């Protein structure tokens, strides 16, 4: 029996919606990353994007445990000397709700062209509404 290898054009992709209200950031991110890669499917192939589309709503209501809201630090750099910026989880959620989830998921995906294609299938919204009703996403409970 030959080992099955999925082809990119044969992959069946579903749409799922996750309500992130009062969910822990890391637990949501790990489940989202798993489904974006397609590891929950029997036809998973490491070098092919077999994952599903994930819509996360209420990303502004994500939480972290302990004192990470003030202690967890995110860094970015402008590219200029001395151009390093840092912010904590609480400030990032206030200013850009959902960006912490995007960064967490991106860090769990493969680096390179395959990972870039996978992260494009993640849609994060701070509120309940999203423009993907036409795709009829299925609710996914975590």
UniProtKB/Swiss-Prot annotation:
The keyword Ribonucleoprotein applies. One of its GO terms (biological process) is translation. Keywords: Ribonucleoprotein, Ribosomal protein. This protein is one of the early assembly proteins of the 50S ribosomal subunit, although it is not seen to bind rRNA by itself. It is important during the early stages of 50S assembly. PANTHER family: LARGE RIBOSOMAL SUBUNIT PROTEIN UL13M, RIBOSOMAL PROTEIN L13. Belongs to the universal ribosomal protein uL13 family. This is Large ribosomal subunit protein uL13. It comes from Herminiimonas arsenicoxydans.
């Amino acid at each position: 029996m030959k080992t099955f290898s999925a082809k990119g054009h044969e992959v069946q992709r579903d749409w799922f919606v996750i309500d992130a209200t009062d969910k822990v950031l890391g637990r949501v991110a790990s489940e989202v990353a798993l489904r974006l890669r397609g590891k929950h499917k029997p036809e998973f192939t490491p070098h092919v994007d077999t994952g599903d589309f994930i819509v996360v709503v209420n990303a502004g209501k994500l939480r972290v445990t302990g004192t990470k809201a003030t202690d967890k630090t995110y860094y970015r750099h402008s590219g200029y000397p001395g151009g390093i910026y840092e912010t904590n989880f609480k400030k990032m959620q206030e200013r850009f709700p959902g960006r912490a989830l995007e960064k967490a998921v991106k860090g769990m995906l493969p680096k390179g062209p395959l990972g870039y294609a996978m992260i494009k299938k993640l849609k994060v919204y701070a509120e309940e509404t999203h423009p993907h009703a036409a795709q009829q996403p299925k609710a996914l409970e975590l």
